Amino acid sequence: MARVVRFHEIGGPQVLKIEQLDVPPPGKGEVQIRVKALGLNRAESMFRRGEYIEQPDFPARIGYEAAGTVAAVGPGGEGFKVGDAVSTIPAFSMNHYGVYGDLVSAPVHAVAHHPASLSWEQAASIWMQYLTGYGALIDIADLKAGDTLVIPAASSSVGLAAIQIANRVGATPIALTRRGSKR
């Protein structure tokens, strides 16, 4: 048995319940993680409120970002072994996976090793802003070396990630923010 956060109706944080559930071993292409830290993000609160790109199937699990140690590896989970320090990457449906819990499974394509220099909290919270920025700049805008772009809200987590992504591809970011104190 493990503690898992689920919800049974759309709503605010009060609909979240900590429940004891039997956790099956990881399936094909899955890694099971003993969670040490969680990241909280807007997508999860939107999912809980029924405002996300997909609607929850009840009872619903929740959570995109977590860090912990590998507890078990399912068939096809090459590259991971029990005890590895890993983070989940928000690249899965919360209707199939949710990482708010003590012991969770995630698809192997959405699990990454992380360096020992990161705390569990840092490792659990580094992905969402980069995936958001990458999707907008690379997948949609097709940003390339030599391009110039304006980044509004550049001091936000996504804005900071967008600056780094632009620099990485050789583009020139122009950063905007509301106040000088947010430099």
Predicted regions and their residues:
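Glycine/charged-rich beta-loop-alpha catalytic/anionic-binding loops adjacent to active sites
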Residues: 110-120, 146-148
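Glycine-rich beta-strand-centered segment in the early N-terminal region that forms part
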Residues: 22-40, 51-92
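Cytochrome P450 core scaffold surrounding the K-helix E-X-X-R motif
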Residues: 43-49
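Short N-terminal binding/cap micro-motifs at the start of the first secondary-structure element
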Residues: 11-18, 42-43
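Mid-domain Rossmann-like dinucleotide-binding core that forms the NAD(H)/NADP(H) cofactor-binding site
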Residues: 124-183
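A structural motif shared across PLP-dependent enzymes of the aminotransferase-like
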Residues: 94-108
